[in-house]
Amino acid sequence: MPYQNILTAFDGSALSVKALEKAIKFAQDHAARLEVIHVCHIPVPVFGGPLYAAPFNEDKDYLLAAQAIIDEAKRLTSQLPDVQVILKQGQPALAILEYAEESGCDLIIMGSRGLGGLREFVLGSVSHHVVQHSKVPVLIVK
């Protein structure tokens, strides 16, 4: 059964560009709808007690950077007729999985972060978490 609704995660990195290119090809080959998601994770610093909210300017900087990434995704997908580019805020892996379920996508395509070694073991990766918890197939592009 061909894919009908493809979701790709995009963060502006070289690997996410490769993943988006693969997603565009899949969408064209299967006459599928393509959705591109970028998740803006604004960290909340904790200093040994109550939460400290980041100053508004820091939040604004994150959102401006996110908008630049969204604009790049729109530019890269401009040749497709039925593309939706979505900006979410939160933990990237959780937001991707939540949106995948909400949107009814039947394939997720994303780049491998490639943290490697100890960093990936300790920190994990967005792609690893998505692969482990997704209810639909996930294609990881390296």
Where are these regions (language model features)?
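Active-site phosphate/pyrophosphate- and oxyanion-stabilizing loops and adjacent acidic/basic residues
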Residues: 24, 71, 75, 128
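General small-molecule cofactor/ligand-binding pocket signal
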Residues: 37, 84-88, 139
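A short acidic, glycine-rich active-site loop
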Residues: 54-68
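Short beta->alpha linker loops
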Residues: 68, 87-91, 113
